[in-house]
UniProtKB/Swiss-Prot annotation:
UniProt GO molecular function: GTP binding; GTPase activity; metal ion binding; protein kinase binding
Cofactors required: Mg(2+)
Lipid sites, type S-geranylgeranyl cysteine: 190
List of residues binding GTP: 13, 15-18, 32, 35, 60, 116, 118, 159
Task performed by this protein: Small GTPase which cycles between active GTP-bound and inactive GDP-bound states.
Matches recorded under Pfam families: Ras
UniProt short sequence motif Switch 2, positions renumbered to this chain: 57-75
Signal sequence, renumbered to the chain: none
Short motif Switch 1, span: 26-37
UniProt keyword terms in alphabetical order: Cell membrane, Cytoplasm, Cytoskeleton, GTP-binding, Hydrolase, Lipoprotein, Magnesium, Membrane, Metal-binding, Methylation, Nucleotide-binding, Prenylation
Catalysed reaction, written as an equation: GTP + H2O = GDP + phosphate + H(+)
List of residues that carry Cysteine methyl ester: 190
Protein name in the entry: Rho-related protein racB
Length: 193
């Protein structure tokens, strides 16, 4: 069975742990406890193939900048996470997270993940009656950032409602499988003159 190591990075409190807990247990965590480092594992079926998916949760706080990269070796795919209701976390994708993972794992594919879309959708409804100073990140902004940083795909999701949750991890696995297919084709290609 093929194994895939998926590391999740992003600012503190953007919903990385909720994403993993909701995906692996179908339950949404009720309280926020900052993560230092945590591991989850699941056997999943993607495109009719069993995959041992190793999920690595990381600390987003600056206090852990020096130890976080210890989880990066042999990473197959990164999920760069930001909250769609936190513009600073969105900006940190290009100023901190993409440069950090590119420095340590220059060849690993990245997916850009916008979390907490349930809150954005809720705010969109309530903004009609109240004046908010912080505008949530739109899908179009996420797509533009995805292209800007060279991520393979942009996906929005909600750990609370589980909207697009399985899709996030299926696409992470597909990113690795597709790269492995391309490498096998390159290795099998042989020209004799």
């Amino acid at each position: 069975m093929q194994s895939v190591k998926c590391v999740i990075v992003g600012d503190g409190a953007v919903g990385k742990t909720c994403l993993l807990v909701s995906y692996t247990t179908n339950a949404f965590p009720t309280e926020y406890v900052p993560t230092v480092f945590d591991n989850y594992s699941a056997t999943v079926m993607v495109d009719s193939r069993p995959i041992n998916l190793g999920l690595w949760d990381t600390a987003g706080q600056e206090d852990y900048d020096r130890i976080r990269p210890l989880s990066y070796p042999q990473t197959d795919v990164f999920l760069l996470c930001f909250s769609v209701v936190s513009p600073p976390s969105f900006e940190n994708i290009s100023s901190k997270w993409k440069p950090e993972v590119s420095h340590h794992c220059p060849n690993a594919p990245c997916l850009l993940i916008g979390t907490k879309i349930d809150i954005r959708d809720e705010q969109t409804q309530t903004n009609k009656t109240c004046d908010k100073k912080i505008e949530p990140i739109t899908s179009e902004q996420g797509e533009a950032k995805c292209k800007d940083i060279g991520a393979l795909k942009y996906i929005e999701c909600s750990a609370l409602t589980q909207k697009n949750l399985r899709y996030v991890f299926d696409e992470a696995v597909r990113a690795v499988i597709n790269i492995n297919k391309k490498e096998k084709i390159k290795r099998k290609s042989c020209l004799i003159f």
